[in-house]
């Protein structure tokens, strides 16, 4: 029992650590601190520990340090869960995904520092980190036996909800990419108004690539908001007796609603840093929850085959 308690605490620490990596990367982008350590990696401006500390150096170096520490903790968590919970079907795959995509995002970050990358490649950085976070989050939920508390092992999801769950999760990744592209192309404030680029001329076409990027992201968000609202309505109507599905989609709709509000406030507050980081946090939580719903779909399929 004592070992299980330690594993739970460690899983929480690893999950929080992955969130810090995500938010740290967003902070690096939003403060334009990506070259705070110059074109040097893994050292910072020619030394292991930076000698001259500026805000940009502090942000970039801290992000690298957190990534290194969390990478080790996730490796430990992966091995630990493999040994203790390897009998649970998803554990080994989730551990592999967590490590693989964490290494991938670190390599993309290093490549950006050493050689520079295009905006469309850089936009993948956040999304790749997000997959690693989702894997660690699901591992933690398994460690805490969330499934047993909500009787998720016996869940049954109909074909309609299965299709919508898989499709909206894949689509959410596209939404994440468009949001990251907004950041990396410096298009966050290209449109001064909300919900249209210019509220005085709401039907006007975008004038340049940056407005297309910004308005394309807003359109993508509108679609996912309506989509998740519909799925939530369906889940509330048809799955009242399956708490994990019922409450899962209610939480998903709450998060996507808050995400839309945060996106609006990013524009209205002229890219306030706290609001912008909250925007990144909410999409991370939403994607993690959608991935959990995917795991429930997989379990439902397995339960159906075993009958």
From Swiss-Prot:
Residues 30-56, 114-123, 183-218, 269-276 are extracellular. It comes from Lysinibacillus sphaericus (strain C3-41). PANTHER family: HEME A SYNTHASE (PTHR35457:SF1). InterPro entries: COX15/CtaA_fam, COX15/CtaA_HemeA_synthase, HemeA_Synthase_type1. Its main location: membrane. It holds the Pfam family COX15-CtaA. The active site is at 60. This is Heme A synthase. The gene is ctaA. Interacts with CtaB. Heme o binds at residues 63, 125. GO terms for cellular component: plasma membrane.
């Amino acid at each position: 029992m004592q070992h299980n308690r330690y594993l739970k605490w460690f899983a929480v620490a690893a999950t929080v650590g992955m969130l810090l990596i995500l938010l740290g990367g967003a902070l690096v982008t939003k403060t334009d601190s990506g070259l705070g350590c110059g074109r040097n990696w893994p050292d910072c401006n020619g030394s292991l520990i930076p000698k001259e500390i500026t805000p940009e150096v502090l942000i970039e170096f801290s992000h690298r340090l957190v990534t290194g520490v969390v990478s080790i903790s996730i490796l430990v968590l992966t091995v630990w869960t493999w040994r203790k919970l390897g009998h649970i079907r998803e554990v080994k795959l989730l551990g592999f995904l967590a490590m693989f995509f964490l290494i991938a995002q670190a390599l993309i970050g290093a490549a950006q520092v050493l050689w520079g990358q295009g905006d469309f490649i850089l936009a993948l950085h956040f999304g790749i980190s997000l997959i690693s976070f989702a894997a660690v989050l699901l591992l933690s939920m398994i460690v805490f036996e969330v499934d047993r508390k909500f009787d998720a092992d016996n869940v049954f999801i109909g074909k309609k909800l299965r299709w919508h769950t898989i499709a909206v999760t894949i689509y959410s990744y596209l939404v994440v990419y468009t949001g990251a592209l907004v950041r990396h192309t410096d298009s966050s404030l290209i449109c001064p108004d909300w919900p249209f680029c210019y509220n005085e001329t709401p039907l006007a076409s975008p004038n340049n690539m940056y407005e297309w990027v910004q308005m394309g992201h807003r359109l993508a968000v509108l679609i996912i908001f309506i989509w998740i609202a519909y799925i939530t309505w369906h889940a509330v109507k048809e799955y009242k007796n399956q708490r994990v599905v019922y409450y899962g989609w209610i939480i998903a709709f709450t998060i996507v609603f808050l995400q839309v509000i945060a996106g609006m406030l990013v524009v209205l507050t002229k890219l306030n840093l706290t609001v912008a980081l909250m925007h990144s946090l909410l999409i991370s939580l939403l994607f993690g929850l959608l991935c959990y719903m995917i795991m429930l779909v997989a379990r439902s399929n397995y339960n159906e085959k075993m009958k």
